[in-house]
């Protein structure tokens, strides 16, 4: 049995898994996948003479009658898929991450499974100049952020068809199980999209690709084909907008939220009638950092602009024990489930990131955990000293390198 299997079965801690990954580099390609060259440089593909899934795994003697066959349909799919796939807890730059031919989508792409997530995933799609991806529909929630390029997406068919035009920085929802097709409007350059989806969760529940990809059902409460579906927007709460399309979240409105740290501002979106995926954006000032916290749900975070680092650890945040990840515009990180993490801005501009979480979905599943935040008086004082050192280093580097190319560390000890 492999360590990745142990991680999913609970007999191998996420902490140990992350430490092994960080020792090898940024990302480990999944077994059975065609790993991009960049992933190979950061973690070699593990050679096996026998697939560990060939061994039947049973529950312990005191659970499930001592003979329940342990099932993990999503993990089984990961092992068997031939699509280009990487696994880890971050990628350096989603705009330049290597992609490979992907027949099912009619273009190029790479599948991202972060930190052993089993509810959410990420996918990078690349559309060649003046080309389109294959028309598709899926029985799962999906949000799209435009990493680069410009193009259009057509949703639905017949009288219920809608079309949007998007560009770099656009955010939109793909309504559940609605036929859609992405096209590149640029005749010279490829377009690149980042999708965050709930495919893993749906695979865990139903275990059927046929159902997920070929369900003949219209969720009219989520998509009714109205002409203003992608243009309407409503402010429902102080920091909440109900909308299905945002032209450019890199410059869109954020509302002050001092409870998350001095100078912090955020915005949340309710999109597509989704009940799991909860997107939000947050930015914070130069020379500041967010309060450390942890949450009982998975999260995938894309840096939109700025430069800094994140500290993370399982049970606490101590400067001497925490792991450190540097980030820049285009970096994507997914903190391990219920680990403490804290974001620091060492750049010369406000840092802004886009995050997708599960919101209160785990609570609705009965998971008895709460969001926990480390308030300033309880913070390890050495963390502030570490931050000050990093700011001085960043300032010195900026003065000696007028056009800096930030170095990216991958899970190093702080």
Stretch-by-stretch model annotation:
Residues 132-134, 152, 171-172, 176-182, ...:
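Histidine-centered metal-chelating micro-motifs
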Residues 1-16, 38-40:
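N-terminal secretory signal peptides
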Residues 158-173, 316-334:
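Short acidic-glycine-tyrosine-enriched beta hairpin
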Residues 108, 123-137, 280-294:
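Conserved short histidine dyad/triad with adjacent acidic residue
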Residues 143-145, 173, 188-205, 301-302, ...:
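A short hydrophobic beta-strand segment most commonly corresponding to one strand
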């Amino acid at each position: 049995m492999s360590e990745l299997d142990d991680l999913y079965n609970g007999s191998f801690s996420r902490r140990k898994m992350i430490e092994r990954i960080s020792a090898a580099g940024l990302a480990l390609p999944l077994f059975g996948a065609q790993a991009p060259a960049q992933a190979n440089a950061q973690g070699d593909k593990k050679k096996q003479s026998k697939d560990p899934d060939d061994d039947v795994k049973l529950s312990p003697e005191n659970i499930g009658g001592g003979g329940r066959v342990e099932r993990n349909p999503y993990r089984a799919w990961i092992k068997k898929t031939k699509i280009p796939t990487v696994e880890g807890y971050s990628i350096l730059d989603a705009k330049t991450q290597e992609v490979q031919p992907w027949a099912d989508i009619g273009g190029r792409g790479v599948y991202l499974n972060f930190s052993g997530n089993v509810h959410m995933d990420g996918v990078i799609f690349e559309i060649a100049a003046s080309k389109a991806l294959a028309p598709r529909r899926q029985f799962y929630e999906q949000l799209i952020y435009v990493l680069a390029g410009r193009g259009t997406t057509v949703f639905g068919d017949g009288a219920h068809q809608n079309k949007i035009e998007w560009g770099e920085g656009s955010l939109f929802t793909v309504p559940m199980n609605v036929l859609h097709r992405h096209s590149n409007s640029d005749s010279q350059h490829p377009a690149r999209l980042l999708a965050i989806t709930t495919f893993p969760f749906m695979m865990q529940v139903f275990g059927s690709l046929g159902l997920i990809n070929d369900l003949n059902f219209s969720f009219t409460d989520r998509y009714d084909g109205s002409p203003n579906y992608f243009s309407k927007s409503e402010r429902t709460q102080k920091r909440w907008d109900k909308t299905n399309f945002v032209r450019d979240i890199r410059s869109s409105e954020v509302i002050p939220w001092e409870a998350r740290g001095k100078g912090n501002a955020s915005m949340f979106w309710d999109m597509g009638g989704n009940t799991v995926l909860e997107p939000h954006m947050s930015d914070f000032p130069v020379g500041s950092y967010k309060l450390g916290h942890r949450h009982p749900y998975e999260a995938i975070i894309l840096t939109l602009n700025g430069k800094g680092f994140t500290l993370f650890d399982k049970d606490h945040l101590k400067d001497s024990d925490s792991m450190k990840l540097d980030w820049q515009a285009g970096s994507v990180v997914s903190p391990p489930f219920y680990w403490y993490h804290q974001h620091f801005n060492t750049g010369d501009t406000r840092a802004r990131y886009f995050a997708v979480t599960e919101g209160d979905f785990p609570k609705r599943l009965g998971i008895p955990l709460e969001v926990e935040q480390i308030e300033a008086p309880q913070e390890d004082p050495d963390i502030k000293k570490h931050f000050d050192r990093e700011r001085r280093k960043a300032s010195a580097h900026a003065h000696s390198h007028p056009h800096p190319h930030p170095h990216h560390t991958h899970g190093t000890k702080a």
